[in-house]
Swiss-Prot record:
SUPFAM superfamilies: Winged helix' DNA-binding domain. Keywords: Acetylation. This is UPF0502 protein YceH. The lineage of its organism: Bacteria, Pseudomonadati, Pseudomonadota, Gammaproteobacteria, Enterobacterales. It comes from the Bacteria. It holds the Pfam family DUF480. The gene is yceH. Belongs to the UPF0502 family. InterPro entries: DUF480, WH-like_DNA-bd_sf, WH_DNA-bd_sf. The modification N6-acetyllysine is found at K80.
Length: 215
């Protein structure tokens, strides 16, 4: 497969895809914006603490690989970045809004069940029902230019199998060690996390508005 993203590259691209949809008024993102998005505590697994220099290195690499492009001029005081990973004018990878939402959520959080994906991707795309979501996953798994996702073996204590993206190469399908977290209902946990994400984004928008009013 031609896509071989490192964990940090996947995080950066996932953040840009997410913010392009959820906070379009703040997109494209500056380096500081990408750092904040990468280190966000909601809707991220694992939570990272990347420095500006670490993020800048990833941005430079992704620009060289034509997955991102810089935006400057026309009133922009700082260089900003936008994704060319998918749905760009000259790019080969074309994804529907539903596919973008699922791929983004998998890039940001790793392997997840369909129920978890539906709750966590809701800020980007509202699936009408589980059948639509599962159909979208199957399309991503069977695309001629893919596959882009794979279904993993069901973990102990879980009712659903998880799915994982394939933009970082093949996935080792090894069940995780059973622990107390397996007793937590995945759907309920995902709903709580989705609410936390919404609150965090509303706070971010409010802070941005207050900053503009203070200028």
């Amino acid at each position: 497969m031609k896509y071989q993203l490192t964990a940090l590259e996947a995080r950066v691209i996932g953040c840009l895809l997410e913010k392009q949809v959820t906070t379009p008024e703040q997109y494209p993102l500056s380096v500081n914006g990408v750092v904040t998005a990468c280190n966000q505590k909601t809707n991220r697994e694992p939570v990272m603490n990347l420095s500006e220099s670490e993020v800048q290195e990833q941005l430079d690499n992704l620009v060289k690989r034509h997955y991102l492009r810089t935006v400057s001029g026309f009133g922009n005081r700082v260089t900003k970045y936008e994704q060319r990973f998918c749905n760009s004018e000259f790019g080969d990878l074309k994804l529907s809004a539903a596919e973008v939402a699922l791929i983004t959520t998998l890039l940001l959080r790793g392997a997840q069940t369909p129920g978890e994906l539906r709750s966590r991707a809701a800020r980007m795309y509202e699936f009408s029902d589980m059948a639509e979501l599962e159909s979208t996953l199957e399309q991503l798994a069977n695309r001629e230019d893919g596959p882009f996702v794979v279904r993993l073996a069901r973990e102990p204590g879980k009712r659903e199998s998880r799915y994982m993206h394939l933009f970082s190469g093949e996935v080792e399908d090894q069940p995780a060690v059973t622990d107390m977290s397996n007793a937590v209902d995945g759907d309920l946990q995902a709903r709580v996390e989705a609410l936390e994400i919404e609150v965090a984004e509303l706070k971010q928008r409010l802070d941005s508005l207050l900053a503009h009013l203070g200028d």
